[in-house]
């Protein structure tokens, strides 16, 4: 392979000159350079400046690099290990294990991280619902197996907690293979997640890839492709249904913005890179389901300053089948998960996909919550006394629905001291239908807070000294 030398180092950007009488490395090729400490660094070609000079982005710290050092072209893009050997392990952007475990053997298959998206005739469309066990998601914004889901929210509203709960529930209940990709997030969260998964026994079915906050922008920009390449292999070669978790897709955009500025490109709206839509499209179009297998992707999307019109979350919206919007005002009310039931959407909330009963219950829940939102202005000015009896009933049921949409998470047990709950879709529909039909009007609203299925509400109310009058609710007490 061709050899060149470093002519300039500016932070993570390294300019390399190759002889003009030889073929230059292609864009996206990986180059190798050994620094004074004997460590091998990987650079990725991003621009051709002319006269044999290529501009590259380093995947690691450029400390110790200097002009004149020899650089070798590997002749191919960055390649990462794929297949069963990746399960239960933690990798960096280059596919090197970072969990302190043994090195992978030389016979482990590797694939390049840059690929074309599947062709149209290879794609498959599925209408099967993926049960998550989280009531608010399963009822109002059901996830499609093989679809793309975005978890939108500002700082500290619970995006990572929901992702961790989804990994737990899906691994325990469905036993599928997961790939978790940590893009530019806190190293502590990745560490906690690793040990939680190890303790719960789901690590053996999960591959983890991290490029966290402390990494150079090149690594944070490419680590999403590393995780995706591992997931694609399970889909295309093993023919499996894979879950791909990305936390956080905004950091992918943010790293792209840093790289763009370092490369000297003119910034676009709000300082983002001019290639924002292209970069997002190249990643998202590869996350899809084919006739061989599926990738169901769940992506956390940080919303800067809670502004949904920011180009980063707005560009991501276009690629998603379902959105779960997390709202700060619900956090302030102590409702967890803080999912906004009126703003969250799903293309699968259709009677032909979820069934007539599920659809009708979901629509009625949304209608009651919408009416409650409209009545809140009157309540805040004139008080509850000015409402009609029907309106008072709507407010009471809406508050019960709002509280019943909350539940305890398994992954939060160590913080709350309360056991988590997994609620099947059938139980979720039954519970909300009973509230809508007025069968639980005599129960106090506090009984609906942070519980699992509707049986838990009835038992909690009894502990509070209230026995339900409805025969169906009474039967639940007798059944215990």
From Swiss-Prot:
Q: What is its main location?
A: membrane
GO molecular function: any one? Answer: proton-transporting ATP synthase activity, rotational mechanism
Q: Which CDD domains match?
A: ATP-synt_F1_beta_C, ATP-synt_F1_beta_N, F1-ATPase_beta_CD
Could you tell me the membrane topology recorded for this protein?
Answer: Peripheral membrane protein
* Enzyme Commission numbers on file: 7.1.2.2
Q: Which SMART domains match?
A: AAA
The protein's matches in SUPFAM superfamilies, at most eight in alphabetical order, are given as: C-terminal domain of alpha and beta subunits of F1 ATP synthase, N-terminal domain of alpha and beta subunits of F1 ATP synthase, P-loop containing nucleoside triphosphate hydrolases
Give me the Gene Ontology terms describing cellular component: plasma membrane; proton-transporting ATP synthase complex
Which compartment or compartments is the protein found in? Cell membrane
What do we know about how this protein assembles, alone or with others? F-type ATPases have 2 components, CF(1) - the catalytic core - and CF(0) - the membrane proton channel. CF(1) has five subunits: alpha(3), beta(3), gamma(1), delta(1), epsilon(1). CF(0) has three main subunits: a(1), b(2) and c(9-12). The alpha and beta chains form an alternating ring which encloses part of the gamma chain. CF(1) is attached to CF(0) by a central stalk formed by the gamma and epsilon chains, while a peripheral stalk is formed by the delta and b chains.
Described by its record, this protein's role is as follows: Produces ATP from ADP in the presence of a proton gradient across the membrane. The catalytic sites are hosted primarily by the beta subunits.
Report the NCBIfam families cross-referenced here. Answer: atpD
Q: What is this protein called?
A: ATP synthase subunit beta
Gene for this chain: atpD
């Amino acid at each position: 392979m061709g050899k060149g030398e470093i002519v300039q180092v500016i932070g993570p950007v390294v300019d390399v000159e190759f002889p003009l009488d030889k073929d230059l490395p292609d864009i996206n090729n990986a180059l190798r350079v050994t620094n004074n400490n004997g460590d091998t660094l990987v650079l990725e070609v991003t621009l051709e400046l002319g006269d044999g000079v290529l501009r590259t982005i380093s995947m690691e710290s450029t400390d110790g690099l200097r002009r004149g050092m020899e650089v070798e072209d590997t002749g191919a893009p960055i390649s990462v290990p794929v297949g069963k050997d990746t399960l239960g392990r933690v990798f960096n952007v280059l596919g090197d294990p970072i969990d302190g475990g043994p090195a992978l053997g030389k016979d482990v298959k590797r694939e390049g991280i840059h690929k074309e998206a599947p062709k149209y005739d290879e794609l498959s469309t599925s209408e099967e619902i993926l049960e998550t066990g989280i009531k608010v998601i399963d009822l109002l914004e059901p996830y499609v197996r093989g679809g793309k889901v975005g978890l939108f929210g500002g700082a500290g509203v619970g995006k990572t907690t929901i992702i961790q709960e989804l990994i737990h529930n899906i691994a325990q209940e469905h036993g599928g293979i997961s790939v978790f990709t940590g893009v530019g997030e806190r190293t502590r969260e990745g560490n906690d997640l690793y040990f939680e998964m190890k303790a719960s026994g789901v690590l053996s079915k999960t591959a983890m890839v991290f490029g966290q906050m402390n990494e150079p922008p090149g690594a944070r920009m490419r680590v999403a492709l590393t995780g995706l390449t591992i997931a694609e292999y399970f889909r295309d070669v093993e023919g499996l249904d894979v879950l791909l978790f990305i936390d956080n897709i905004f950091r992918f955009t943010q790293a792209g913005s840093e790289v763009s500025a370092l490369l000297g490109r003119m910034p676009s709206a709000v300082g983002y890179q001019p290639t924002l839509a292209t970069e997002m499209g190249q990643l998202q179009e590869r996350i899809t389901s084919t006739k061989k297998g599926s990738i169901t992707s769940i992506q956390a999307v940080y919303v800067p300053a809670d502004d949904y019109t920011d180009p980063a979350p707005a560009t991501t919206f276009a690629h998603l089948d379902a959105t779960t919007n997390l709202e700060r005002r619900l956090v302030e009310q102590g409702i967890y998960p803080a999912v906004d039931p009126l703003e969250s959407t799903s293309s699968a909330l259709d009677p032909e996909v979820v069934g007539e009963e599920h659809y009708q219950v979901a629509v009625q829940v949304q209608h009651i919550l919408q009416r409650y939102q409209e009545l809140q202005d009157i309540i805040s000015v004139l008080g509850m006394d000015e409402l009609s009896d029907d309106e008072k009933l709507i407010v009471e049921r809406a508050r019960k629905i709002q509280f019943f949409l909350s539940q305890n998470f398994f992954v939060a047990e160590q913080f709350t001291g309360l056991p988590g709950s997994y609620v099947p879709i059938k139980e979720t529909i039954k519970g909300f239908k009973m509230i809508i039909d007025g069968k639980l009007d005599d129960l106090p609203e506090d009984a609906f807070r942070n519980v699992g299925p509707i049986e838990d509400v009835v038992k909690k109310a009894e502990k509070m000294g209230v026995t339900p009058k409805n025969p169906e609710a009474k039967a639940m007490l007798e059944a215990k």
